Amino acid sequence: MVVVSKNNEQQSLILTTELLRTAIFNISYIRGLFPVRYFKDMSVPALDLKMKKLMPMDAESRRLIGWMEKGVYDALHKKHLKKLIFYICETVDGPLIEEYIFSFSYSDSDSQDVRMNINITGINTYGGTLNSTADNSTADMTLNQMSSVDEDFGQNARRSNAFVTYQRFSVYISFHIANYRLCYFFASVQRTILMKLLYYEYVPPDYQPPFFRGCSEEEEAQYVWPKIPLRMEIGNVNSQHHVLTVKVKSVLDPYDPCEDENDNMQDDERSKGPDSLHDDQPCKVFTKPSKLILTENKDADHGEVNEEKLLLITPICEILQDVKQDQVEHQLAKVKDTKGRPASIVQNPILQSHEYDIRRLKARLQRLERHISVPDSPQEGIRKWFAAVSSQLFYKVMEACTRRKPILGDAILSSTVKVQNFNAKICSKLLKKPASIYRKKHFTLNSASLRISGLAGSIFAWAVGFCLFSAQIGHVFVQPKTRSSESKPKVTMEELEEKLTPPSSEPKSAPPSSEPKSAPPSSEPLEKLAVIRRILPEIFAQRCGQRNSSFEAFAQRRTTYDYYNIRLNPREIIFRRLQEESKVALALSSANYFVLSILYRFFRQWSEVSLVRRNSRLTGNPSNEAQSSRSNRIEIPTLLDEPDREGSGGHLAAPEDPVDFLAQFDPLIDLEDAYNTQPQYTEAEVNARLLHEDHVEFDLVPVVSWNTEITAKKTLSTTESVAEVFALCGSGDRPLTCMIPGENERPWNPPRGYVCMYEAYFRQCHLWFPIPSLIISFLNRRHMAFSQLTPAAICNFVAALTFGAEEGYLVNVRCFEEMTTLKAIRSPGYWVVNNRPKHNFLPGPKVSNFKNWEEYYFYVRVDLESYERPFSGRKRMWTEFPDRYRPSPDFPVEFEGVLEAIFRARRRTWKDVTRSRVNRIMGKVRKSFISFAAGLLNMPPPPAPIEEERQPLDGEAAASNPPVSAGPSGVDQVSHEMVNPESQDRMCLEGADVVPAQEIAECDRSQSVQVVEPEVQNITDDRSVVVYAAPPAGEEVNTGLTILDQDKDETVAEPGISRRSREEKGKGGANQSKKRSASEAGLDEAAAPKTFRLSRGETLNSDQFTFKYSGEKFLVRDQEAASHLWRNLMLPGTKDFPNPDDLVLKEGYQKFARSSLETAALANDLIATYDRKLKLKLADREAFDNLKKCADQAKAIYAKDMKEMASLRDAAEIHKAEMSSLNDEVKRLNSREADLQKEFSDLQVALVAVKEHGERECNRLRNDRAAKVARTTKKAQARLDRVKAYLKEQEDLVGPKVDAENQARGAEEIVGILMQRGAKIAASELSGLKELTKRATDEVNALNVIELGDDDLNMSPDQLGFSRQISQVAPVADQHGSNVDLLAEVIRRVSVEETNQTT
């Protein structure tokens, strides 16, 4: 671990970007924005923290990654970014659900220290405040404090990790875990994520990073909050040059206060307020009334609650389906109804201290413990037990958070002991037995669980104990409660499942009576655990109202989970099923659901390990899984795989090849061409893309247990044992590079460019180099390390490849996955590949018990010599959860052919799969043989073939024990078991060869020099790299099949090396024979019976004889019989050959005869192989003839087509001319179109000008007309005023005077008339009358009256100047009408009246 005190600007930028990316990706994971399979586990070994990394699985995930890496990082690198706001909305148009604000500030000062301050403060929805900080001594944490270590690495590392875990979970508990039930609802609905960037003022206005654009004010105002959000300030990280501050806003209610339970143990019901998450779905909820008062502060003097700060909250007792009802009014009405009811004031557990909550939970636990009794039903019993245990755990978590212990894991561990005692009390009450039995026997935590530091490990250990304890008491809840004192019979597993499984409509066949019944639940914990797994879903289903549904009904709802495209285990199906029902909030109390969410979070990964796919169903812990003889368990690290080299920009210089290069079905005609379909690489290309051979870098730290010791054991492999393995698998002529792990190296931390392998892969499983592409593709698809496979899995790979190659097929990975399943074994980290029941291509007994195979491992460099595909399947670190195989509805196209070919193979049992058979079929037949003349010259015997012994049956040990180094254990370097020559020395020419260990040892000693020449290169003090180079070109490698003499009892072990004792298995020393020799029995050794009989009969011909062999060995292995048979093989005319027993060179002749017969046997095998391939070639010739006929027909058709093509070419020329003319016309039309476009544009310009001119003229005429109308109106008004003045003058002034004058004149005329008629009037009166008339006339004449002209009297519009043209006026006969008739009538009436008066 590197201690860092100062960071440069580049390191500061990297730290800030990594923190930002981790925050965004973990928020996406916690809130369920993407499916779980889109995230990859990452870890920080220095801090023991696990994170989630979003992988580009689809367009949406790639888009979010592009926003971060190309957009946000660009602005951050240029120091333009001020704030990054990450929104989570319900829909595209809002409203907002959560808002994460990341603020950035930049500094060029190097004087600051790298610090992290986690201080959670916030304001809730109702105005209250919340705080969650560490002590003053640990509130701020520098990078040195996080990374520095001293000599006591284990203790300080655990304390530092526990502190970091506490800091992380203090944030998690105060905000995220309280919202955990809301996180799962995100997965069932679609959410919209938005990202907004704010820049500093100095940033250019036109700057926009990739994937981002400018935002208008209308768009910003579009997204609003549905209610007042909760505001929280998480803290800040100062990395010297960059300061990152995090704030959160959310409308999700983080508070989930628990209601006090009644004394009668009624179920807790959860109230639903107007701001609940489920208000968008109308439902009917019934709860008991309650009051909750959230306070911001208290009066310190009087201790009373401030009435102004109170907010009364009551549950909605019933929400009807009527959506028109105002929820606010409904809530206020409920407030009025509850005002008169007594209620207790409950303080919020997060706003106030935790002490009240702890006291409350203590009282609740006392009530639970007091009311625990034998349940009436299994549902009630499990509910009460689970409520009590979950409340106890929640209480301990809150107590540990309140006390702020330095190591939170120890506090939780101590709480688990109290949980154990509490559970024991419950169980003792349920079973009427002492509590000590269950406290000591069934709830003991394994020490391995203590190695996981922090709260996560403690909850994980508690979850494991919960399942084990549930398995032990599972049978209690199905026993009915009776008052009888008689002992209750134990319920078997079959009766348990029958009672818990709902009745089915289909009749079930009764099980045969011959099958024995299963043991009671208390006998097998694993079986009872499986029963509990089937019980819990049924209990939860009945708890949610699904009483008539079973687990199968839940599992069939696959359409709901097709969105995730993953295989869900039963527990995950049940949880997601519960999330679909809104009543789940009412079925469990708040504390129960809180712990249930934690258990689901941390217990899901543990449960998935033991669940695999078998016949499209999920099962747990099958009984036929491969077991291991390991006595110690290992902690599996979860690390990241790294490339060998990095190119520019951090990209891989050696990208991995496609996983499955055999995408199509590929039948093989010749086995030698089998591997031509894979990509070919040159040695220079591979060396350029991989690390250099001399470069060895151990970049992975070993896993340390709780007592600071490296887990697992050091390897027992040595350079000699690895050389023996290479020679055994026929790789002596390949320049392989291997490394023996040192004291601190284990299978999961090899150096870069190396992978770990076990010797059992090659000794017992017959694997070879280079590693086949099938295994590499399988590991690449599963993201597993090579060393995670068990030898049983390698056996299935080797058998599938061998059987397929015998029939001319190369098995690809897709077909292999359809025939097999991947399953975890009991040893953590190891996985076995088993055949499916319907596709069991390897029948018979399986070799599943490889003794101590995991103790012999070594590292091999990945190159062309060790891997067929050196750029794939190079994962070094182990993974806890390999990628599962997701079967498609249809099988691959080539599956049927490959499956039939494998099942056509002969001798498909594992004992028939031998090393010689594998070498011969997979193209590794030995090509050099020993000369028999070497034995005649008294030369050292040649090496014998290295072949495996026959595999044992019925669970016996493997053919050879793994070799170990010489030392205290005293185990032989070669360690092959001795085989009795008289009982087991048989050889099958087809491939089932068994060679005595004596010859194998001699062959090993001779081949240790001839086959390989190791070159040791010292790398460190305790490890070395061994390169096994090829022998010189001039030397011939003697790897023939000649067998040494077996009659001599020679010891194989070298001086100072002893064999492993097998007395514990009753097998004696080096496989002692049950038969005694003749000398030991006191008999004459020469009297041994003959194994053959030679008879010539009555024939005189020397080459006509009958040879009958009755020995237990094969003829080619019996030297005496072979020599007598060989001596009778003579040419015509030759003399009889002497008896071989009388020869001087008897032994030499016997060896020669035996070698000759072996050569003949090999020739027979060679001819048979040639005949088989020749038949294939003949079949190919027939196919070639058919192909030739087809080719001739194709040529004729081609000639006919050429003739037709000539005519078509002529037509094409004509069409070309037409096309040319049409192109010219198109050009002319295009030019005309351009002219018209120009003319159109000109006309548009002219139209605009005309419109402007028309508007100007219209305005001018309108103004002129308005002025003229104004003038005309003024003129008419003036005339009218003059006429009015005239009329008034006439009426007021002129009229009276004129009337006086008229009266005077009338009087004068009347007097004149009277005087003419004889009347006498005085002269004075006449003169006075005249004077009066004259005076009146003078007055009238003296008047100056207004005179009206014709223009003044004419009021016509024509005279006023506001008239239309004459042509526009229609002629009218009497325009103004006439009153002649009226006047005439008036005149007649006046005249009549005058006449009457006159008369």
UniProtKB/Swiss-Prot annotation:
Q: Where is this region: Disordered?
A: 257-281, 487-525, 617-656, 940-974, 1045-1090
Where is this chain's protein located in or outside the cell? Chromosome; Nucleus
Protein function: Required for normal meiosis.
**Entry's InterPro entries?**
HORMA_dom (IPR003511), HORMA_dom_sf (IPR036570), HORMA_MeioticProgression (IPR051294)
State the protein's name: Meiosis-specific protein ASY2
Organism domain of life: Eukaryota
Gene3D superfamilies per record: HORMA domain
Stretches assigned to the HORMA domain: 10-248
Acidic residues: which segments have biased composition? 257-266
Please list the residue ranges that the record marks as compositionally biased, kind Basic and acidic residues: 267-281
Pfam families listed in its UniProt record: HORMA (PF02301)
Q: Where is the composition biased (Pro residues)?
A: 509-523
Q: Which residues form the signal peptide?
A: none
Locate the compositionally biased regions of type Polar residues: 617-631
Keywords, A to Z, come to: Chromosome, Coiled coil, Meiosis, Nucleus
Question: What do the Gene Ontology cellular component annotations say?
Answer: chromosome; nucleus
What processes in GO biological process is this protein linked to? Answer: synaptonemal complex assembly
